[in-house]
Amino acid sequence: MIVLSMNQSGEVRMTSIMRDIWVDLPGHGEGRINAATTYGGAELAMRIVSRYFDLRIDKYVMVNIKSMVNIIDLLGGVDLEITELERLYLNTCTARTQWESQSGRVIPPLEHSGLVHLCGDQAVEHTRNRFDGGGDYGRTARQRQLLKAIAKKIRTKKDPLWLLSMARRGRKWVQTNLNPLEVGRIALLALRQDPNAIGCFRIPAEGTYTINDAGSWHFETDFEKNRQLLREFLKNGRGSDEMQ
């Protein structure tokens, strides 16, 4: 899960909520925070995240893996910086899944690391990678990296009509409680935002949790400390986008 917000200064913040945070799930006992969506959809997920991190979240956008592939392809792909290890992982994945891709296409292997252009299948596989030594920490960082890349792609067009057309065409792949007017406002706002200025953070922050591997592997989180750090980040942007 990612919380996207804008503070009073108009600065955009992106906060990953790691899936292994252990919480109370009303009516379902205790479990990982990502189970909230399974048990109660977006409404329960918003309620749980709001309660534990002292936020007021009432709007959501949900996109599954296949839909994200379609959305990225609709935009014409994205440009991302990848490491050599990430390149090797991607080539292995696309070779294995090319017959299962949404378009049925054969995806050519990436020939170099660094800045590369990725289609939807490649970009989504990149965000799912947990095998580069960074585990789930790296995965959440790549998710934020992809959202920034999408924002950059949108901003390069500098065309409100194109963006509104993309929003209408992509609507079928998205579940949201945003109304059309709100979607339009956010789309136009995206044209004015500098993706490089988007602040990124991860919850739980380093040093604020312990790993419990007795039974169901999860994070025992210092919620008060994380609420404090999150408030500071959302207000002043003092956070970290480290992958460790």
Each PLM stretch: what is its role?
Residues 36-102, 179:
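Amphipathic, coiled-coil-like alpha-helical scaffolding segments used for oligomerization/assembly
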Residues 1-5, 13-18, 32-34, 48, ...:
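Soluble periplasmic/extracytoplasmic beta-strand elements of cell-envelope proteins
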Residues 30, 42-50, 65-69, 73-75, ...:
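Extracytoplasmic/secreted envelope proteins and their assembly/folding machinery
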Residues 1-38, 137, 219, 223-232, ...:
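Extracytoplasmic strand-loop-helix segments at the start of, or within, the mature domains
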Residues 73-161:
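Flexible, polar/acidic helix-loop-strand segments at domain edges
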Residues 6-9, 17-22, 38, 65-68, ...:
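Solvent-exposed coil/turn segments that connect beta secondary-structure elements
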Residues 31-39, 54-59, 130-138, 151-157, ...:
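Second-shell loop/turn segments in exported
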Residues 175-244:
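C-terminal solvent-exposed extensions
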